[in-house]
Amino acid sequence: MDGMRIDFHTHTTRGSADSNMDPFAMIDQAQKIGLEGLCITEHDNAWDDTKIDDYAREHGVTIFRGIEVTTEWGHVGAFGLKQYIGGIYKVKQLRKVIDDVGGFLIANHPFRYKLDPRFQFIHKTPAIDANDPVSGYQALEVLQYIDEIEVINGACSEQENLYAHAVAQHLGKKGVGGSDSHSHPSVGCAVTVLERTVSTVQELVGELRAGRYAPGQGLHVGQMRMFP
């Protein structure tokens, strides 16, 4: 699929304490592998740095800002917010706030560690049948409030990603891809390919709502292909 390739999920040292990726190094890596867009989705934080924007433009990369919101039901990628708003750790409130601004919500890595019984003790969700996507949807209440599902995440196992894709298909969703990079070598390992070029978050949301996109993988090693 030809189009604009965007990594929907990255973290930098400017806004995520668990990241060791300098944003300038991230942009250099994006240019090197032919990635046209980067969504910077810091943890519970939206920052604005025009120097980053200018540097990205000079290198042929477009920056889109989002927030990875930590909610009571897991991480949710939020697009359309200019700053963190109190109370959005509750998914229902986050949904209301996003609707008010015409934004978009993505369930990030929704099945990470949830398919392995050894990790069941750390989750409050019911057990999930790895062979039945319906059970995954029923187990995660957050999926009732989001617009899309991250079906390929660079830090998830193949099983987790394929299961997320199966659940997305069950719900009639295409799924998106993001590397979840915290260091620059993994930038672009999972991407979302848009049919049309966009330059603002508003345009990005418009393309998502129009369904003109598909998840992809392997760009970081020069083996770009669609997922799965």
Question: Which residue ranges define each predicted feature?
Answer:
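Short, conserved beta-strand segments within well-ordered enzyme catalytic domains
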Residues: C39, T62-F64
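Charged catalytic cores and adjacent phosphate/nucleic-acid-binding surfaces used
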Residues: M1-T12, S16, N20-Q29, L35, ...
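Internal, conserved structured core segments that host functional sites
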Residues: G102, I106-L115
